[in-house]
Each structure stands twice: as structure tokens, then as C-alpha cells.
């Protein structure tokens, strides 16, 4: 979609500057289709992080993120807590989705935690949603960009 291409361009810029990127998706089921779009655009495979991957794979990904070898992670809520060496951008796709809320064990909202991490690390965050949320549109730092189908700003 148009919104995906816009934030892919932002992510490409971050990667070209030597930083890592994190894309949060609300559901594990969205990962496969999203990963295909990513590979078509970037020409490489991102790391994928969620509860369904094996312990061995998690260890490999954890190490690759910590040493900076892995440039992009597509993940569920828990990917926020990965040890990025040089995180440069967080993207929360479908930020309005209730799946970002963790209600069992330690309760938190991954969207809010992403905002906090971006603030703590002094990096940009892109909150992607079909329309502005009231909480965002009232923020003094909120900028709304609307796109038509041809991707030209309105």
C-alpha cells in the first residue's frame, strides 16, 4: 500500500546511514505477507521476531541485532526489547490495533513503549494508522500527511 512505501523510503534512508530499523506489526499472521513486500523493495530478508520462532533462531537474531549485523527486524510486541546496537527508526504499523496491548503477565501497550523507547534513544518513530488518533492529533509535535492513491501529499 501507499503508506507502506512511504515508510519503506524512510527506513531505506536510515539503513543507508548505518542505522538499524524496527517495524512492529500487530499480528504474527501478517508477517509472511509483509516480509515478501519487504524483500521485493529492499532486496534482502529482514529478521523476523515473534513467539513462534525457535529458541536457536532467537539466539542467532539476538546476537545479530546486538552486534549490528542485522539491519531490520520485523516483529511483534516483544521485539521492542531487543538489544539494538544502533537503532535509528521505529515504525508501528496499524498503531490503533488492540493487539499491541499485553494483558497477561507484565501488562503494557507496545505502541506506548515504542514511543518511550524512541524518546529515550532520541530517534524518530512513525505511527502508521488509516486515520489520525485523537491522542496523536492533539500532540504539539504531531504532523499529519495524507496521501492519495498516487502517493502525492495532499
What spans do the regions from the language model cover?
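Conserved catalytic network of the ASCE P-loop NTPase/AAA+ motor domain
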Residues: 13-17, 39-41, 64-67, 81-84, ...
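Residues immediately C-terminal
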Residues: 30, 79-81, 96-101
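Loop/turn-to-beta-strand initiation segments
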Residues: 19-21, 45, 68-72, 86-89, ...
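Hydrophobic residues in beta-strands of the RecA-like P-loop NTPase core, especially within AAA+ ATPase
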Residues: 75, 92-93
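Motif I (Walker A/P-loop) of helicase-class P-loop NTPases
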Residues: 3-12, 114
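Post-DEXD/H (motif II) to motif III coupling segment of the RecA-like Helicase ATP-binding lobe
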Residues: 89, 95-153
